[in-house]
């Protein structure tokens, strides 16, 4: 399993997501994970730009999968099935390693 991520927090990568009601929310790309070898797709972890920490000092992180387009651009973000334990375990393992660095 391999993963790529950017530790340079000065140069943030941002993405805008639009919900079902058309509301736009700006997110920072926290981490991208190369899961093509194991699962045939990549993953991205996002945190809202204006996220506030809860009483435990935590912020909500959202995870999505995506398959790169043939031209190398990112494809459409897809939710990760809740019952996909192997995918969630891999994401959690990579995220925990990222947070320890």
Swiss-Prot record:
It holds the Pfam family DUF1292. Transmembrane segments: none annotated. InterPro entries: UPF0473. It comes from the Bacteria. PANTHER family: UPF0473 PROTEIN CBO2561/CLC_2432, UPF0473 PROTEIN CBO2561_CLC_2432. Belongs to the UPF0473 family. HAMAP family: UPF0473 (MF_01448). This is UPF0473 protein SPD_0182. It comes from Streptococcus pneumoniae serotype 2 (strain D39 / NCTC 7466).
């Amino acid at each position: 399993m391999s993963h790529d991520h950017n530790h340079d927090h000065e140069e943030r990568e941002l993405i805008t997501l639009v919900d079902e009601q058309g509301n736009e929310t700006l997110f920072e790309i926290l981490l991208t994970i190369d899961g093509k070898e194991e699962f045939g797709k990549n993953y991205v972890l996002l945190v809202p730009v204006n996220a506030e920490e809860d009483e435990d000092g935590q912020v909500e992180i959202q995870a999505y999968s995506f398959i790169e387009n043939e031209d190398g651009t990112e494809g459409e973000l897809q939710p990760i099935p809740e019952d996909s334990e192997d995918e969630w375990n891999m994401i959690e393992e990579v995220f925990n390693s990222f947070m320890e660095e």
